Amino acid sequence: MKLTLWTYEGPPHVGAMRVATGMTGMHYVLHAPQGDTYADLLFTMIERRGKRPPVSYTTFQARDLGSDTAELFQSACRDAYERFQPQAIMVGSSCTAELIQDDTGGLADALSLPVPVVHLELPSYQRKENFGADESFLQICRKLARPMERTEKVSCNLLGPTALGFRHRDDILEVTRLLEGMGIAVNAVAPMGASPADIARLGAAHFNVLLYPETGESAARWAEKTLKQPYTKTVPIGVGATRDFVAEVAALAGVAPVADDSRLRQPWWSASVDSTYLTGKRVFLFGDATHVIAAARVARDEMGFEVVGMGCYNREFARPMRAAAKGYGLEALVTDDYLEVEEAIQALAPELILGTQMERHIAKRLGIPCAVISAPVHVQDFPARYSPQMGFEGANVLFDTWIHPLTMGLEEHLLTMFREDFEFHDEAGPSHHGGKAVPASAPRADEAAEALPLTGAETAEGGSIPPEAVPPAEAAAVPAGEIVWLTDAERELKKIPFFVRGKARRNTEKFAAEKGLTRISLETLYEAKAHYAR
């Protein structure tokens, strides 16, 4: 573990909470100090759930460490069963309680409760949230699911959706509609929405649909081996992936690969006249591996973007992420350090960022358009409306979500043609985004600099000379360390496409600083360009 301001994933017990909270009739008894109860807010405040998670905490304090914490845990188990009467109980420790090394599974078994008890041993200091969810779901399946006779009608299970998942609620509905349109019934959705009784009948399905490998792949692999159920490998995000998914499901179910795409609008919208401005837009993607790999395909093949960078924060999926990145001629960024992600974005200077809530903050600081494609997300990404990411309707949602942050094509032309216009100037931003407009008549630093006398450095032929030649008295006209752009240089800079303009500005200012210049003229800009082109 390491101390950080932001984190992409919580500790493993948060993943276990996501599984328990998504289920019905399940209760999670967590051996944890009072401070770890913060996790409740993730579900009630961020996800807007109408009830608190089915989790009981031992909430031991410092003074309890000298006494019997095991008895505290057993009391919490007894109280949880008597109060909530769950069909099954999960038991485990938080990252803090793991240091005490109480055997929560053995302690719970010693109580001889009349319901199944699922033991969770989650290595808090080696693994993180997605692993915790994946492992918890696996242990629940191992404890409760058994081979059984298949349903008469071809059916499948949907595996992987959890509480606090990115659009999981709507993805379930969209994929269920897609499957039912093919004549395939959904036997169970798990863990989200499933009860322990539903888990027990997972074996009745003919095959499994793995929606989210991060949180369901271990259970899918176990079911393939133990329940003899094959599982799908294609995640239906985007038009192409959805068609591939339909073909894969049809092969497993022995039905015709047909699906109702009458509601699909994304391909035509992407090919419409105004959408030609999408072609070649440089995009950077970061998030969980499943969503990033799927989104990269949509970005390049369906929207016409140029993928200039991609990566994931979950190291368990580093191998498939690196393999996918190679297909775009890229090296994947696999890190859980948001500062590394920010550095990569600054270096690449993309026109659009597709990422998590973290990248939304980064994009805001850098002034780059951004859309969220992956957890972790904030409250606004749990919308009241129907907004899936998967299936044909999900493809429509992707188009709208990704295009909204961008300046529209016609408006880009107006910005180019009327760059100094009161309405269509660079600082105004897209017209469909409120609260960003800056009057074109606002005084600028470069105009103020016009009145200042030039130093010997800028008046010299060629635009720059070594700093020693600048008389100290004249250099004092501008505060030390401050670099000012002159009007002609600023005007020329605006002719550079805005998606690389920031990088050009930074490089020029760096060049000027190295040369000891305090004002950037047109000649300085050209010299910097030639310097970095070498």
UniProtKB/Swiss-Prot annotation:
It is an enzyme of class 1 (oxidoreductase). It catalyses: chlorophyllide a + oxidized 2[4Fe-4S]-[ferredoxin] + 2 ADP + 2 phosphate = protochlorophyllide a + reduced 2[4Fe-4S]-[ferredoxin] + 2 ATP + 2 H2O. One of its GO terms (biological process) is photosynthesis, dark reaction. It comes from the Bacteria. The active site is at D274. Keywords: 4Fe-4S, ATP-binding, Bacteriochlorophyll biosynthesis, Chlorophyll biosynthesis, Iron, Iron-sulfur, Metal-binding, Nucleotide-binding, Oxidoreductase, Photosynthesis. Pathway: Porphyrin-containing compound metabolism; bacteriochlorophyll biosynthesis (light-independent). [4Fe-4S] cluster binds at D36. Binds 1 [4Fe-4S] cluster per heterodimer. The cluster is bound at the heterodimer interface by residues from both subunits. Belongs to the ChlB/BchB/BchZ family. NCBIfam families: DPOR_BchB. Component of the dark-operative protochlorophyllide reductase (DPOR) that uses Mg-ATP and reduced ferredoxin to reduce ring D of protochlorophyllide (Pchlide) to form chlorophyllide a (Chlide). This reaction is light-independent. The NB-protein (BchN-BchB) is the catalytic component of the complex. Protochlorophyllide reductase is composed of three subunits; BchL, BchN and BchB. Forms a heterotetramer of two BchB and two BchN subunits. PANTHER family: LIGHT-INDEPENDENT PROTOCHLOROPHYLLIDE REDUCTASE SUBUNIT B. This is Light-independent protochlorophyllide reductase subunit B. The gene is bchB.
